[in-house]
A protein has these predicted regions:
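Bacterial N-terminal signal peptides that target proteins for export
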Residues: 2-15
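Hydrophobic core
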Residues: 16, 20-24
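Sec-dependent signal peptide cleavage junction
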Residues: 24-37
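N-terminal accessory beta-strand-rich subdomains and adjacent acidic, glycine-rich linkers
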Residues: 35-355, 718, 722-723
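Active-site-proximal substrate-binding groove within the catalytic cores of carbohydrate-active enzymes
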Residues: 55-67, 245-250, 255-289, 462, ...
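Terminal accessory/anchoring regions of large secretory-pathway or extracellular enzymes
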Residues: 328-368, 372, 376-408, 651-682
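Aromatic-lined carbohydrate-binding/catalytic grooves of carbohydrate-active enzymes
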Residues: 360-445, 449-504
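Structural preference for beta-strand elements that scaffold enzyme active sites
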Residues: 406-408, 452-454, 519-522, 561-563
Length: 730
């Protein structure tokens, strides 16, 4: 018996020795987990100074463990969190590290995951992670997923060259770690950050099944090349009562467990032009809070078979997305584990990658003016002149004499033919406002007085009533002309200009403009739109469109003083000012709180200007929001009464007369200039809700601004703030 026992011990020792040798072989990174909150089936595959990365091979499930506080982030549903009420499809979805959809014929709803679908995964281990090569036999397609832990960041990438498909089925979408950092009902305290407008949060509390859907928005707005054209419905044939949702300006989202002091900011680095941000609170299909990026690889669309659209066929795109699909998770802990930490992390990321450069942040109130419009008159259209160059000089002189020492002014409707004679092909001003020479003199003369006048150029649209659009108009993927229609007065149909035609048109305009010795330009249209389109039998994706627009903006920025209207993040590096920064979100029902996230990222780098103050229903609250976000005020004014616009396309500008808002401009200028002098070019370091209705903004130069949205005076942290007011503490 003793001999048998000794022999058994020898066998066990030999097996342990073999196991130790295997784990020490080059390229083999599997290490048995030891942490109490790491299931035994997970093996450690990478480690940095701050984190350990664990992997469960069958489902490509990973766990991130913070080495300092021991907190973890799970990427798939753990057994102890399974409430047992989900069907097999959803259970498989939540247990899989990657989820795809497949397109077969005209159906794009097949779920493809690592649990319910036959697959083969082979792993190759690297110094800081692994590469998983995945093949789905049933659909005869596959891809590779590279996962690497670099310091405080987890990078997840599907290389473009690793994607393969065969004729039996196509890949529709790819969702990487769709449960990363999930939580069950209200088991965790915290929130999901979504880039809706300036920013919003969805709390991780129990939603009691109130919502049927969550946040699902395409990065950089919807793709007009695939969507059907619609006509605006106006109240009393005049007023647009439907507010468009805010666009996703930046490819980011986040999850934060505030009590555990761990979370992440996710940056969609590659493939973002064809990806959506998904953030679904518990109760939306399942009882788990989750956020992720969903990449579109191929779409189906409806193709008309004839010009009358009497016959159609649903088909998949002829080609797939050709781009890496990559998400970078910036891991945040301790004092950085909140949305302020997310904002700082994103700003530092942009700066480190040359995507955000410091512009002149000197304070200037923005006062825009409308030059000319058009209205129907018998057979022809006639000019409706609202503000001439002489009248602008008169108003400038009035403001200057009342202490407004600097100004930024965008001149709209300056071009021959008025505001909606687009695209603008050359520098030629409308004679009704004084002509080209008068506009040039206005810009150059007042620049010496620190009044910067920018000419507005809407470069996306083409007006078929005023210009030949035969060779310039965009056609959608289905080869039908892309038209924007409305029931407004005068002009009711516009086309998009082909991106490469836009490049040619803008090059000629900028050349003719700068030849006159002026170079202040406010660019719009192409700054907040990208789309797929067809041309001469070829299809062009949003990647192609964005690349063209980026080149256009970059080239113009080298030749002009360029300010951009609500630009997408990939254009921020070339913006000397950000026009029309949203101060809120789309106010979806599932959003619990709005935060000035984008403003926190950009403050101190790019001057930001609000939407127009004179069209705000609650000007007092809007003023406080601007102060809180570090955004400068904007006005859209005319010398003549706005009643003159009643029969023009600008009939919605119901209150613009300068005399009405003169005193407001002067007062806003004095107040915001004083605040800007205190904050200077400092960054926002923190944003906090210190009490109900009272917010605190801390700058990195030590300045603190308290904003009180309540009607009564409030004392917080030893500082008293009057009702509906703000206080700067240096």
């Amino acid at each position: 018996m003793a001999t048998k026992g000794f022999a058994l011990k020898r066998v066990i020792c030999m097996l342990l020795a073999v196991l130790m040798c295997i784990t020490c072989l080059p390229g083999t990174k599997l290490t048995a987990s030891a942490a109490a909150n790491i299931p035994s089936e997970y093996a450690q595959v990478a480690e940095s100074d701050s984190y350990k990365l664990y992997l469960y091979e069958p489902t490509m499930s990973v766990i991130l463990e913070n080495k300092t506080n021991g907190q973890v982030l799970y990427s798939t549903l753990m057994a102890e969190d399974d409430d047992g009420i989900n069907n097999k499809t959803w259970t498989a979805y939540m247990q899989s590290g990657i989820v795809l959809t497949a397109i077969k014929g005209a159906n794009d709803t097949y779920q493809v995951d690592l649990v319910s679908c036959p697959n083969e995964i082979s792993y190759e281990y690297t110094d800081n992670g692994f590469v998983a090569s995945i093949e789905f036999k049933e659909y005869d397609f596959g891809l590779a997923v590279e996962v690497s832990l670099e310091g405080d960041e987890l990078i997840v990438c599907v290389p473009e060259e690793s994607i393969y498909e065969n004729s039996s089925a196509y890949i529709g979408t790819v969702s990487l770690f769709p449960m990363m950092g999930y939580s069950y009902l209200d088991a965790k305290e915290g929130y999901m950050f979504i880039p809706d407008g300036n920013g919003a949060m969805i709390y991780l509390d129990d939603k009691d099944g109130r919502y049927a859907s969550g946040f699902s928005q395409v990065i950089y707005g919807s793709d007009a090349g695939f969507t059907d054209s619609t006509t605006e419905v106006l109240l009393w044939e005049r007023y647009d009562t439907v507010v468009d949702p805010e666009k996703v300006l930046a490819p980011i989202f986040g999850m934060m467990h505030t009590e555990d002091k761990i979370g992440y900011l996710a940056i969609v680095e590659d493939g973002n032009q064809r990806a959506s941000i998904e953030a679904h609170p518990n109760g939306v299909m399942v009882n788990y809070n989750r956020c992720f990026a969903k990449f579109t690889v191929r779409k189906i669309y409806v193709q008309p078979l004839n010009n009358s659209n009497s016959g159609t066929v649903t088909q998949a795109e002829a080609d797939r997305t050709h781009s890496n699909l990559q998400v970078r998770y910036v891991l945040l802990t301790d004092d950085a584990a909140d949305y302020s930490g997310m904002a700082v992390a994103y700003r530092e990321y942009l700066q480190a990658n040359g995507m955000l450069e410091a512009a002149d942040t000197e304070y200037k109130t923005r006062v825009d003016f409308l030059g000319t419009e058009r209205e129907e008159f018998m057979v022809f259209k006639r000019a409706v002149t609202m503000t001439t160059t002489e009248q602008m000089e008169e108003m400038f002189a009035d403001l200057q004499s009342n202490g407004v020492n600097s100004l930024l002014s965008v001149y709209k409707g300056w071009q021959a033919g008025g505001l909606y004679d687009v695209p603008i092909t050359k520098y030629k001003a409308d004679g009704e406002i004084g002509g080209t020479s008068a506009v040039t003199e206005l810009i150059t003369d007042w620049a010496e007085k620190n009044y910067d006048v920018y000419l507005y150029n809407e470069s996306l649209l083409s007006n078929p009533e005023e210009n030949n659009t035969t060779f310039n108009a965009v056609k959608k993927v289905n080869k039908r002309k892309l038209e924007i229609t409305s029931r407004d007065n005068v002009y009711q149909t516009f086309n998009y200009v082909l991106p490469f035609k836009t490049e040619t048109i803008l090059d000629k305009f900028v050349e003719s403009y700068t030849d006159k010795g002026v170079n202040n330009l406010a660019l719009a249209g192409i700054t907040d739109n990208i789309f797929s389109y067809s041309y001469s039998g070829k299809f062009y994706t949003r990647f192609d469109c964005a690349k063209t627009y980026e080149n256009i903006v970059s080239n113009i920025a080298d030749k002009t003083n360029l300010i951009l209207e609500e630009p997408f993040a990939y254009l921020w590096k070339d913006a000397q000012a950000f026009l029309d920064m949203p101060l809120g979100s789309s106010a979806y029902m599932y959003e619990d709180e709005e935060i000035p996230f984008m403003s926190m990222v950009l403050k101190g780098s790019i001057p930001m200007y609000s939407d127009y103050v004179n069209f705000q229903a609650n000007k007092q609250e809007f003023r406080l929001q601007m102060i809180e976000a570090g955004v400068y005020p904007s006005f859209y004014l005319t010398y003549e009464d706005s009643a003159d616009l009643i029969y023009t396309k600008s009939s919605d500008l119901y209150s613009t007369k300068y005399d009405t808002y003169r005193d407001s401009v002067i007062a806003y200028d004095a107040e915001f200039k004083a605040i800007a002098e205190a904050t200077a070019d400092a960054y926002i370091a923190r944003h906090d809700k210190v009490e109900t209705g009272v917010n605190k903004v801390t700058y990195d130069n030590g300045v603190v601004i308290y904003v009180n949205y309540t009607d009564n005076a409030v004392t917080v942290e030893g500082v008293t703030i009057d009702g509906l007011s703000a206080k700067v503490v240096k």
